[in-house]
């Protein structure tokens, strides 16, 4: 059996805290669940893990921060695994209060390098007196028992909007705690959009892999409208629950034509497009992880029409150029600086 993340190992070390029906918020490894003493609710933001949880007959799954109404006030113990973003900790604690019964125990587990010390200040605001019950595997475990439950929890109450502009195109982007580049346009995406203005795709359908909050699709929609070009459809996918929610909201507000769906990579994606575009992630939590993009590059040709274009922005130090050349074809650098590079490649036409 493969090793669990440190936070999950520490929970099992303190399994005595799981009294009654538990809720585990922020599960990152499904193999934790059968090792817990009793089943309950398991929440994950990761689409691939959600697919695994959805087939579990014992645990009730929750994809991100949209619980079923009947899950409100149903848990005796709620465990919060510390998220990367401080603002998301507040969101996760609010969900914990919604799921917990009156008098439920609230447990927070996090690694020291992930900022557990700062999170405890947030924890004490909602749980009153909190006590550290363990410290192991570079993690701390804190528990509070005076948490006031929430009778209402609406993800839309946490939604924010940011007005952005790039290459003469204005757009509104939805945001939630934990979403990439919340409240701003990251420099890599800006460079990518600028190349789209200078060297348009010239197609009517695009697939946006790792679409985040829907920035690229919203921008393409606005760019085509502003230039009087043909309408464009931009479908997108992302692995994170908040990103999928925000992208759908961004598309709805802008009137973008396209479908946003949750997926871990391309395995469940059907069809192909004349252009695929991406600003892919290279972090899992606080760790560098390029495996998702490497897998994407190995599979994306099957979703590109013959002669179709892949356009991708990435940090310049990441080793993607050779992979693009291997799986798609000759590579061109449309823009580059010390930090980012925009690559373009075309799938070879058949015959």
Swiss-Prot record:
The organism encoding this protein is Marinobacter nauticus (strain ATCC 700491 / DSM 11845 / VT8)
Answer yes or no on keyword Methyltransferase.
yes
UniProt-annotated location(s): Cytoplasm
Tell me its family.
Belongs to the methyltransferase superfamily. RsmC family.
Enzyme Commission code(s) on record: 2.1.1.172
GO CC annotation terms, alphabetical: cytoplasm
Which enzyme type, at the first EC level? transferase
Q: What is this protein called?
A: Ribosomal RNA small subunit methyltransferase C
Record gene name: rsmC
Where is it chiefly localized?
A: cytoplasm
Catalytic activities: guanosine(1207) in 16S rRNA + S-adenosyl-L-methionine = N(2)-methylguanosine(1207) in 16S rRNA + S-adenosyl-L-homocysteine + H(+)
Function summary: Specifically methylates the guanine in position 1207 of 16S rRNA in the 30S particle.
Read off the InterPro entries from this record: Mtase_sm_N, rRNA_ssu_MeTfrase_C, RsmC/RlmG, SAM-dependent_MTases_sf, Small_mtfrase_dom
Q: Which Pfam families match?
A: MTS, MTS_N
**Organism superkingdom:** Bacteria
- For whether the record's keyword set contains Transferase, the answer is yes
Oligomer status and interactors: Monomer.
Single GO term (MF): 16S rRNA (guanine(1207)-N(2))-methyltransferase activity
The coiled-coil regions, if any, are none
- Which keywords accompany this UniProt record? Cytoplasm, Methyltransferase, rRNA processing, S-adenosyl-L-methionine, Transferase
């Amino acid at each position: 059996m493969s090793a669990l993340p440190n936070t999950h190992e520490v929970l099992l070390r303190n399994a005595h805290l799981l009294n009654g029906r538990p809720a585990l918020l922020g599960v990152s490894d499904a193999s934790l669940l059968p090792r817990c003493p009793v089943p309950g609710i398991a929440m994950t933001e990761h689409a691939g893990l959600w697919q695994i949880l959805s087939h579990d007959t014992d645990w009730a799954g929750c994809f991100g921060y949209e619980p079923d109404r009947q899950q409100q006030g149903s848990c005796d113990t709620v465990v919060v695994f510390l998220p990367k973003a401080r603002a998301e900790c507040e969101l996760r604690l609010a969900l914990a209060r919604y799921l917990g019964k009156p008098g439920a125990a609230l447990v927070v587990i996090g690694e020291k390098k992930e900022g557990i010390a700062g999170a405890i200040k947030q924890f004490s605001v909602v749980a009153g007196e909190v006590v550290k019950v363990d410290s192991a595997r570079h993690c701390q475990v804190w528990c509070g028992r005076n948490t006031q439950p929430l009778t209402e929890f609406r993800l839309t109450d946490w939604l924010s909007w940011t007005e952005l502009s790039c290459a003469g195109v204005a757009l509104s982007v939805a945001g939630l705690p934990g979403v990439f580049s919340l409240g701003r346009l990251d420099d890599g995406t800006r460079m990518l959009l600028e190349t789209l203005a200078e060297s348009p795709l010239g197609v009517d359908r695009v697939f946006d892999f790792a679409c985040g909050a829907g920035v690229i699709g919203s921008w393409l929609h606005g760019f085509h409208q502003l230039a009087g070009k043909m309408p464009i459809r931009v479908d997108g996918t992302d692995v994170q629950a908040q990103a999928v929610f925000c992208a759908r909201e961004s598309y709805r507000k802008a009137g973008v034509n396209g479908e946003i769906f949750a997926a871990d990579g391309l395995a469940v994606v059907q069809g192909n497009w004349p252009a695929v575009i991406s600003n892919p992630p290279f972090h899992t939590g606080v760790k560098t992880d390029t495996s998702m993009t490497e897998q994407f590059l190995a599979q994306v040709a099957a979703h590109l029409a013959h002669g179709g274009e892949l356009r991708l922005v990435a940090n310049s130090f990441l080793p993607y150029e050779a992979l693009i050349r291997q799986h798609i074809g000759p590579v061109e650098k449309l823009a580059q600086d010390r930090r980012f590079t925009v690559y373009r490649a075309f799938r070879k036409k058949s015959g």
